[in-house]
Each structure stands twice: as C-alpha cells, then as structure tokens.
C-alpha cells in the first residue's frame, strides 16, 4: 500500500499555485482595502436561472429552523429528509437518496469525516456556524464528483474572510430547551484593519437523554417480538407468561449529547485578490441509541402526558449508563482559499480551495471499555476558474482528493482503505434570445486501495444538458437531462463483518461496477406580485444501483446483508407555494404550503421496494410580521410508509405542529432577538422511515425552546 505522503503529492501540486497568487497580492497596491466580495456559491455560475433546483436558507429564516443536525435543520426544504440516529446524528437525504450519494460540504469542500461510513456517525458540519446553507437537488456530479449523484448540501461559514469589514462586528446566541435539558450557545466575531481581516466562532451544546411520547420500540417491532416469543414458546411447549425485560418508555435511553467546537480564520486582501485560511476543531461525545437492546427496569404505569417526572434522575454523567454504547470524537480541520479577479486575458476569476482534516473517534462499550476506533486523514483541493468562451459563461476546474481510512476493533466491519480521486470538469450557460442553455461534462478517476485484497480503479464520465424557457412574464419552464456515474465507496466494496449500527452482518463485493444514473427533471415556476409557486418532477433510471440485499440467513441472530447491484428507478415530484396575503408598513401576513413524494423500486424481483425511502409529506404554514414581532406556525403531515423493502417494517405517519415567536428590540445600537419555539406540540410519536433505528428510537417528544440572540 502506498504511503500517505505519496498519495497526497498530486494534491499538494495544486498548492504551488497559491504561491503565485500570494506573490501577486504582495505586488498590488493597498490603497483600497475593501474590494467587492467574490461571491462563492455551491455552483460557480449565477444561482438565478439555474435549471437545477436550488434551495437557500439564510438570515432569520435559517435562525428559525436551526437544529442539532443538518438534516433536521433542512426539514422544511421540499425533497429533503433526515437519516437520524438519535438527536446527535441527522445526515440529509435528498429525493430518497442519502449516504454516499449526497455530498455534504463546508465552504465547497467535502466534510472529510466518516459520516458516510455508518449511519450512527455524526456529520462534522455544524449548522450553528452557518451563514447560509445551500441545497442542490438532483445530480451534481459535474462539479463535485460521484459522491454527489443525489445532490449537494453546502454550508457557508464565512470562516475565511473575503473582505475587510469596516467595523468590528459579532453575534452571540444562547437557547435552552425543556426536552433533554438541552442548552446551545454560539458566537462569532468578525473584524480587521488595513489589508487583514479575521474571523472567530465557537459553539457549545449539551443535552441529556430526550423524552419521547411512548415506547422506544415501535408498535410494529413490539408486535413482531411478541410473535417471535409466542413461536418460541410453542416450539418448546412452554406456555407460561413471558416476564421479559420491560420496554423503555418516556425516555430514549442513551440519547445524550455533548459537543463543542470553534474556528479561527484570517485573510490578506488586496485590490483584486485575496488569500486566507481557517483552523477549526470539533469535539463531541454522544450516546448511540439502539446499539444495545437493554431496557429500563420499568416503564411505569404512572407515566403521564408530560412524561418528564424522574427525568433528572434518569441521566447522569453523559453516557456512563451501563449497557449504552458511546461515541467520543475529535476533529481538527485546516482550510485554505485564494482568489483573484481577471488573472489572465479571458479568465474572469480564479479560485483555489483546499481542505485537510484529521478525524478520530472511539466507540466505547457499555462497560466503558474502548471498542472500535475509526480514523481518517483526508485532503481535498479544487482549482476553479470562470471564463467566457464561444458565448458561454463557464467554469472549468480540477478537483483532487485523498482519504486514508481505518477502523480497528470489534465493530471494524471494513478494512483500512486508501482512496484517491482526480476530476476535470466544465459547466457553462448561454442565452439564445429568451432561451437559456446549460451544459457540462466531467471526467473522474477513482482508486480504492485496501490494506489486503485487490485494488479497484474506476473511470467515470458525467454530462448534463439543461434548458430554461420563460413563458411570458410570470411563468418559467426548465428541464434538465443528466447522465452521472458513481464509484462504489470502500464500505460497499470491502465490508466484511458485524455492523451493530445497522443491526446486521455486512458483506461487501469487491467486484462491484460503477453505478450510473440517467436523470430527467422538469420544473415549472410562477412568480408575480404576491404569489410564488414551483412544481418539480423527476425520474432517475439507475443502472447497477448499489444496495444491501437481505440474504435470508443469520449469524449470531444478525441478518446477513450482501452489497449487490441491480437496475432501479426513482421518480417523484415536489410543490412549494407562497402567498403574501396582506402587507402593511412594518410587516405582513404570508401563507405557505408544500408537498413532496418519491417512489423508489428495483426494476425486477419479488419485493422491488428499496428500503428507507421517505413517505409523502404535506406542509402548511403562516408567518405574521408586525414591526418587532414575528410569529410563524407550521403543520406537517407525514404519511404512513407501507411500501417497504425485504425484512423492513412499515412506519406509521405522524403530525408535526410547530410554533415560533420572535421579538426584536435594540439596546443602544445593538439589535437583540428574543424567541420562543415549540416543536411537536401535539406530542406525536414521530419515526423517520429514513432512519436505520426508526423502530428503536423515535424523534423527540413535545419540546419548548427559548433563546436570545444579540448582534453588535
């Protein structure tokens, strides 16, 4: 196996370009310290008019929906769900696709963590440090590689300044929730002088085990277990009453969470260019609900509607409960960015990004003994330049990444693997009268080098063509045809052993081929006066779709799952509407509604349903704004999911009623926002069908949160 230094040598070759940019910075006059900010988005071209659906959360809208995980924060975006694993973990699922098919990024560089490796691994991108969050729905492989075949979530942090602020500014917020006694605090500071700018941010979160409306296990799971016990009694001729363990009730065992992190960033900014860096760290310790099948002693018939009595005594010392597995992680990340306007004739802007991450976590068993150690050292860089050629506004670039991954211990279900990726891409857009045309291509080479066994290499090609046609002044019709390819990830190729997060034995297949997807999507948009409306539909035809097939056998009472391939089809549609019903000086009344649905099936077989596909969702909401007062109420109906895969249990639907009230005031020149939020106000039992542990761990019960945010 090649050394890590040699693996990354090609990546660091791009860093030499930074030296040239830095030299140019030094040669430029410093008479103008504040330049027009280089706009950096998940897409290098203008987000306005893209054929691909894009959703952006920022400002007050983002503050209203912030949650402990990225997936939960994005819950209101049509087509986006969360693959939760307790309150600590919630990776986004876009249009039914998640895991290695959705790329989670921080400032256009991959998160570089191990959240793709297992559903119980936390994503290291923190929502509370975000300036904005962008979602590219649908294939985004042209820009970001095969890991984005289902879409992209990009969190913009502002940690590397692009301009020198005129004044020192900052913000601080603290919020506290009754459920799980959760406390979150975060703050940031931005300043600078001359040609230099700096950024500081930090956050802290602490939460106990959270309260749930009823049993931890679903009714379907309890019925299945009861049937199995009945069958066992019949087999042994034993008809005595079963006196087994009492089920967890009212509190989800081992769902506690503690996390902290922060970052320092600085930039040198010239007249036409800049160079900057950021250094960040992230530490967390959280319980893994569902890792063990231990139960509390009693669920208690005295459980009342508030299900909070005795909660303070239930959780102690954050994860020291006997029988509960705990994950303890630490990450250090370094980011570098440099940009220049008009560096050469015909090139409008040049941007270089590099991210390096050193990550490790230890999974402690219930006894407190260290179990499996997951570690990764990863680096990703991209050189991107925008230009005009043949009438096209375009962006071309190079992307190189290197990842050294290892898992050592009892739950090490995959061997150490080194992954190398190299990509070349081009995307462009042009107008022909009112008709807008988008096109792009990408070539990518991926090497997977395991510690033992055969190295695999993949050559991948992707292409896209999109059209945007205005239909009068109010309507716009857009369509996009994509062909994308994805290389199998290490877990799909080389898994071989028990994986307790998925409650299974996972067997990889080192002979897997690349996965291909032909996607056709269309979007109709209406915008006029007080009404905005969009309707999207899509169909994706997968060739050699990679999935885990249940073999029907068990080892040590765990089902054996085999990574395999088959053709599959996903289809769905989304609707989103906003109506500004009333307006007055200082505010107004706005109503909104939404709907999304996705269907995913293999093209052949007895049970063709792909597991963990989200059910239909309906959303209604209203926002009232009057001077300093804002109030928002929203209701979401999540349907039953009965179209289940092999050995998958159906999931009951639920309602989610939420309320957010905010009040703004000024203390001197400093704006302050007070807010009160209520989530799951009807205390419904909410189980996410996208979660591996949905039958063992429901979402939080009724939660009331209060907080304050101050800016200066």
Language-model features: locations:
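Short, acidic, small-residue-rich periplasmic hinge/interaction motif at the N-terminus
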Residues: 27-63, 71, 99
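Transmembrane beta-barrel wall of Gram-negative outer-membrane proteins
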Residues: 180-206, 218-289, 328-347, 392, ...
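N-terminal periplasmic accessory domains that precede
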Residues: 70-73, 90-93, 102-105, 120-126, ...
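Flexible loop and strand-edge segments within Gram-negative outer membrane beta-barrel domains
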Residues: 253-255, 259, 273-350, 356-378, ...
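Short acidic/polar hinge/loop motifs at secondary-structure boundaries
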Residues: 110-139
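Outer membrane beta-barrel strand-and-loop segments of large Gram-negative receptors
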Residues: 376-385, 423-425, 512-513, 519, ...
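Gram-negative outer-membrane beta-barrel transporters
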Residues: 392, 432-434, 534-542, 559-642, ...
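C-terminal beta-signal and adjacent terminal beta-strands/loops
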Residues: 213, 485, 541-543, 642, ...
């Amino acid at each position: 196996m090649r050394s890590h230094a040699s693996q990354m040598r090609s990546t660091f070759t791009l860093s030499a370009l930074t030296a040239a940019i830095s030299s140019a910075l030094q040669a430029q006059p410093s008479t103008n310290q504040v330049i027009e900010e280089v706009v950096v988005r998940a897409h290098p071209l203008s987000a306005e008019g893209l054929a691909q659906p894009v959703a952006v959360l920022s400002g007050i809208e983002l503050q209203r929906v912030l949650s402990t995980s990225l997936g939960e924060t994005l819950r209101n975006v049509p087509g986006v769900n969360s693959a939760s694993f307790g309150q600590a973990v919630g990776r986004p699922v876009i249009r039914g696709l998640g895991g290695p098919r959705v790329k989670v990024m921080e400032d256009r560089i991959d998160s570089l963590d191990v959240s793709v490796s297992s559903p119980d691994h936390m994503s290291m991108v923190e929502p509370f440090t975000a300036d904005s969050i962008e979602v590219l729905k649908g294939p985004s492989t042209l820009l970001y590689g095969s890991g984005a075949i289902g879409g992209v979530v990009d969190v913009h942090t502002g940690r590397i300044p692009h301009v020198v602020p005129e004044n020192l500014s900052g913000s601080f917020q603290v919020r506290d929730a009754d459920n799980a006694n959760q406390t979150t605090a975060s703050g940031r500071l931005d300043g600078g002088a001359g040609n230099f700018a700096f950024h500081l941010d930090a956050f802290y979160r602490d939460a106990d085990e959270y309260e749930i409306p009823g049993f931890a296990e679903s009714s379907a799971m309890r019925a299945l277990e009861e049937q199995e016990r009945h069958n066992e009694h019949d087999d042994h001729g034993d008809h005595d009453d079963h006196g087994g363990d009492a089920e967890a009730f009212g509190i989800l065992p081992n769902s506690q969470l503690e996390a902290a992190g922060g970052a320092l960033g600085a930039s040198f900014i010239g007249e036409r260019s800049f160079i900057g860096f950021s250094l960040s760290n992230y530490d967390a310790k959280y319980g893994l609900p569902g890792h063990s099948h231990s139960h509390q002693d009693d669920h208690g018939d005295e459980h009342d509607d508030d299900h909070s009595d005795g909660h303070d005594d239930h959780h102690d010392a954050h994860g020291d409960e006997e029988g509960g597995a705990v994950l303890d992680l630490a990450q250090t990340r370094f980011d570098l960015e440099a940009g220049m306007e008009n560096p050469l004739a015909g090139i409008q802007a040049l941007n270089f990004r590099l991210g390096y991450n050193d990550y490790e976590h230890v999974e402690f068993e219930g006894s407190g003994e260290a179990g499996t150690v997951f570690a990764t050292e990863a680096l990703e860089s991209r050189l991107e330049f925008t230009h005009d050629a043949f009438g096209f506004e375009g962006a071309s670039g190079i992307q190189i990444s290197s990842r050294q991954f290892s898992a050592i211990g009892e739950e090490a279900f995959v061997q150490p693997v080194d992954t190398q990726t190299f990509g070349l891409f081009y995307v462009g857009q042009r107008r022909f009268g009112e008709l807008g045309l988008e096109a792009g291509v990408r070539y990518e080479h991926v090497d997977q080098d395991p510690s033992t066994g055969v190295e695999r290499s993949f050559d991948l090609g992707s292409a896209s063509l999109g059209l945007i046609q205005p239909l009068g002044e109010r309507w716009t019709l857009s369509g996009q045809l994509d062909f994308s390819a994805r290389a199998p990830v290490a877990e799909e190729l080389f898994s071989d052993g028990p994986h307790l997060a998925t409650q299974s034995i996972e067997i990889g297949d080192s002979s897997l081929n690349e996965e291909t997807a032909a996607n056709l999507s269309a979007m109709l948009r209406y915008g006029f006066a007080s009404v905005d409306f969009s309707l999207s539909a899509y169909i994706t035809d997968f060739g050699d779709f990679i999935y885990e097939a249940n073999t029907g056998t068990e080892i040590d009472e765990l089902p054996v799952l085999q990574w395999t391939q088959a053709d599959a089809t996903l289809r769905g549609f989304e609707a989103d509407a906003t109506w500004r019903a009333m307006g007055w000086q200082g505010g107004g009344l706005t109503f909104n509604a939404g709907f999304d649905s996705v269907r995913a099936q293999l093209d052949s077989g007895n049970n063709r349903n792909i597991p963990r596909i989200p059910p239909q969702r309906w959303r209604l909401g209203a926002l009232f704004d009057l001077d300093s007062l804002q109030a928002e109420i929203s209701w979401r109906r999540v349907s039953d999911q009965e179209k289940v895969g092999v050995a998958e249990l159906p999931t009951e639907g639920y309602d989610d009623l939420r309320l957010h009230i905010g009040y703004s005031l000024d203390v001197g020149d400093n704006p302050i926002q007070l807010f009160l939020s209520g989530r799951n106000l009807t205390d419904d039992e909410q189980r996410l069908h996208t979660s591996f542990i949905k039958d063992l761990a429901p979402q939080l019960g009724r939660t009331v949160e209060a907080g304050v945010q101050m800016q200066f």
